Regions:
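Ser/Thr-glycine-rich phosphate-binding loops at phosphate-binding pockets of nucleotides
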Residues: 15-20
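Conserved acidic
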Residues: 2-11, 22-27, 31-67, 72-626
Length: 626
């Protein structure tokens, strides 16, 4: 498959080192690298001069920062200088998360800031490993406020070595992706470009036809009002939690953790999915049609089944007098719902559905087709399988497989962002104004049915292993008592189930949190597998010593079952023998461990990281328990 046309812009990696006094923050060092040469600055005006020079030398340039949201908070004054000089500034920011900021001097000279984490969502240490360019350790340890007061900022100082390496890693990684044709701002954008190009290839000549209308006929532009209405029926993955507390595996009742090999990719490959402009009707479609229904229903859980459905809209919970996020067992009032035909079938397996006779249902009926992206998936699967695990090519190919479906659900609502000086903040800030992208090329029904099939496939395994045996489910995995079921397909290829682990015990905590004990006695973090939303799982630079908030859970796994427990201490004492041993052997003090997590806070001049605690919570006040 020929890659999309390469972007002509010159690619750079950038990094900032910053300091703060607890109330305000400032730039200490700036490095912009093309992987071979580096440009150093120590203030806003210096960065502005460097960017101007690079634009005049190369025309259009793209500078990637790893975690642009953080760095952009310091670069706002630089952007403001260009803006005041009548340069055009266009910022793409979604939900306060910047995707890109483009500064245009004239038709042939521009700089675009992008976030390399949007293309490789890994920390910089992992990215360095992917390209064989290890991240260096800071010679100054942690960056406490005032850390830079003795820094040597002279041209040939060794104090530039650390930031140079970080900028080099970003530059080399992004340049490799651009050279291979992955030139969009995000991984999903890369996938979208490649998929559209693949659809436009002439099967006879094998060449891409930029004027081909096949994509538009398959995924036509939908009216914004229809998109908004159907969006009420778009939902993501499921999370189910039962048997909370500690459970031990036995020979008679083992514990099995199963995962699907690429859930969404398998749906794209094998399942019939909607295409084209839907036909509207008030009559129930035939069973073999794909449709979206607007219906009014009541639900009641069937005997022997587990409840899993949640209302997406807060008003539905209010009607029942429930907190938002409640798992539905039985409803006592009618609810107008937007549901795909796949979801209606899945619901009918677990719930008795009563339809309101006084409500006239409405349906959007779609044509359907399977395997539209078969060639795309096979291509990137082959790239992944031919690449060494952990390399940039392997990681990026995996992202190309997994990132395509979500782009279909991109909302037409967007933002116009202007950089203005706010007197109240004493700093520059982005002022957002909601607007509509009337020409959006997203096609929401495709994403609606992809996630609906994924939920159905997950619940198919739930029924196969027995509802009473289910411990935890999350999007594409099921943890349960007992062996794998022979009623679902197991294997190594796309869409089959595989054994992730067979733990000897599990601590089931609730919504997106559990700890599996893979073997006793516990002697290292490798003997444990953990999932806990909101709790970072970090190691020290050696990769041997766990640090931060999850230390409290490793130290006593039973804590993950304590809903409402607060994690995070400035001076935590480790109690478990195995974890104390690891700390002592690696030169750390197990009696004085900071387990707080760092949360960014915007201050005048930029961003500082504040220590914060975390409460273990199901993100719902009520959760069905057995």
């Amino acid at each position: 498959m020929a890659p999309p046309k390469k972007h002509r812009a010159k690619i750079f990696g950038g990094d900032l080192e910053t300091d703060n006094d607890g109330e305000s923050a400032w730039i200490v060092q700036s490095c912009i690298s093309d992987g071979e040469r580096r440009w150093h600055d120590t203030d806003v005006q210096g960065i502005r001069r460097t960017l101007t020079k690079l634009m005049w030398n190369y025309g259009d340039i793209i500078v990637y920062y790893h975690n642009l949201k953080y760095d952009l908070s310091f670069l706002k004054p630089v952007i403001a200088i260009f803006q005041d000089a009548d340069c055009e500034v266009r910022a793409t920011i979604r939900r306060r998360a910047p995707i890109s900021v483009r500064i245009t001097m004239d038709k042939t000279h521009s700089v675009t800031f992008r976030d390399s984490m949007k293309k490789l969502p890994s920390d910089l240490r992992q990215v360095g490993r992917m390209i064989g360019l290890p991240k260096l350790e800071s010679p100054r340890g942690s960056f406490e406020p005032g850390w830079s007061k003795d820094l040597d900022l002279s041209k040939d100082s060794d104090d530039w070595t650390y930031i140079d390496r970080d900028a080099d890693i970003v530059a080399v990684a992004m340049l490799q992706l651009h050279k291979s044709g992955r030139t969009a701002s995000t991984a999903s954008g890369d996938a979208w470009q490649w998929a559209k190009r693949m659809i436009g290839v002439n099967p006879k000549t094998g060449k891409y036809n930029p004027h081909d209308k096949k994509w538009d006929s398959l995924f036509p532009h939908l009216d914004v009002e229809l998109d908004r209405f159907l969006r009420h029926g778009y939902a993501g993955g499921l999370n189910i939690s039962f048997h909370t507390g500690y459970s031990m595996a036995t020979p008679e009742r083992p514990i099995t953790h199963e995962d699907v090999h690429n859930m969404y990719g398998s749906v794209l490959m094998w399942d019939p999915l909607p295409i084209g402009i839907p036909t509207e009707s008030d009559k129930w479609p035939c069973d073999d049609f794909l449709f979206v229904a607007h219906v009014s229903i009541k639900l009641s859980i069937k005997d022997g089944m587990i409840p899993w459905f949640q209302f997406k809209e807060g008003v539905d919970n209010m009607i029942e007098g429930w907190p938002h996020g409640t798992i539905v067992e039985c409803t006592y009032h009618w609810h107008e719902m937007i549901l795909t035909s796949v979801d209606l079938i899945t619901l009918s397996h677990f719930y008795d559905i009563e339809f309101c006779e006084d409500f006239v249902p409405h349906f959007w009926i779609f044509k359907q087709r399977e395997g539209i992206f078969k060639e795309y998936l096979e291509y990137w699967t082959a790239v992944k399988e031919s690449s060494e695990k952990g390399t940039l090519e392997y990681t990026s190919a995996k992202l190309m497989i997994n990132s395509l479906y979500g782009r279909f659900a991109l909302a037409p609502e967007t933002e116009e962002n202007k950089l203005e000086y706010c007197e109240d903040l004493g700093d520059w800030d982005w002022i957002s104004e909601d607007t509509l992208n009337e020409e959006s090329d997203a096609y929401l029904p495709y994403a609606m049915f992809i996630t609906a099939y994924a939920r159905a496939r997950l619940l198919e395994n739930v029924m196969a292993v027995g509802c009473d045996n289910v411990i935890h489910c999350d999007t594409d995995s099921v943890i349960h008592f007992g062996p794998p079921s022979e009623d679902v397909e197991h294997g190594e290829h796309l869409g089959t189930w595989g054994i992730e682990s067979e733990p000897v015990a599990i601590y089931e905590g609730g919504f997106k949190r559990y700890i599996e004990v893979l073997r006793y006695p516990i002697e290292s973090p490798k003997d444990i597998a953990m999932a806990c939303a909101g709790v970072p799982q970090k190691f020290d630079p050696t990769g041997k010593v766990p640090v931060g908030m999850w230390v409290e859970l490793l130290d006593d796994p039973a804590r993950i079952c304590e809903t409402g427990r607060t994690l995070g201490q400035a001076d935590y004492r480790i109690g478990s023998e195995w974890l104390r041993r690891i700390y002592i052997e690696n030169g750390y003090d197990p009696d004085h461990v900071n387990t707080n997590k760092l949360i960014p806070e915007t201050v005048p001049g930029g961003t500082i990281l504040r220590e914060r605690q975390h409460c273990l919570n199901d993100m719902m006040i009520y959760r069905f328990r057995r």
